[in-house]
Amino acid sequence: MTVRPIRPSDYDAINALHRRVGWPERSLAGWRWLEANPARREVRAPPGWVSVDAEDRPAAVVCNFVQRFGHAGRPLHGATGFSIIVPPERKGASRGLIRAFLDQPDLFARYTLNANALSAPTYGLSGMKAWPPTTHALKLPWIVDPAACLRSRVWRALLSRIPAEAAHRVGERVMNARLDAEPALRLPPGVFPLTDLSDGSAYGAFWRRLSAEDRVLADRNPATLRWRLADPDQIRRPLLLAHARNGRIDGIALAIVAKANILDAPSLEIIDLTALEGAIARAVSSLGAV
């Protein structure tokens, strides 16, 4: 099975693979946003790989998201494998795709998130290990809309016996109407929405202090965060909050609305929650209370 890097001409076929499993498709603007990832360009990594058929058409795919990291002033790069789609008739193609992902040069880490029970053994066969060893399977959900969760389960049961692509034609069934409205946030003292991400902003000063500390950090400098928040395919604008003490930011939280497919209830996923040394307990407690 031939594996090669993704090309722009593959996007329609990759979206068709997403439809087959009931996953959201990317718009052309969304694919171009991924192409523009500055970290990916620095290490000249492809946006992913496809396993192709005899006519060189994508028949299976893994996408590649490169991020900058840093430790004590040393720049690092890591990559996340995502949207791994291997139809039943391409059984075995996952190994070549995962191997292409793992063989990328100039990276200190290669990983994937949210591996389900069906796909997890495939990663183990490729030499990947669950990490952290004791908490990798731990999730902490707060159910705030039980009715939406129940509707999601009912629709899954009703549509479980038909192909995901056919289920996709049923259309959206569990989107929460509240997502179309700007929420009135009740924020703890010291917590506020963060809107100024210019290089000379209070957030920029926070990032410079944070990146000087002796720990590995995902790069969230102002320019990177501006690019990250500009994803044209996001369901709604991410929630970015800061905690400040004595007029200086000492912690931030970033959360996004996630919805893996039309049958999933929307959820708010915390993807960043970090603070300066010495302010972790105070800032994380306040930000987490939101």
Protein language model regions, located:
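Acyltransferase donor/substrate-recognition loop-hinge adjacent to the catalytic core
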Residues: K129-V216
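A conserved beta-strand-loop-helix scaffold within acyl/acetyltransferase catalytic domains
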Residues: V3-I84, G190-A275
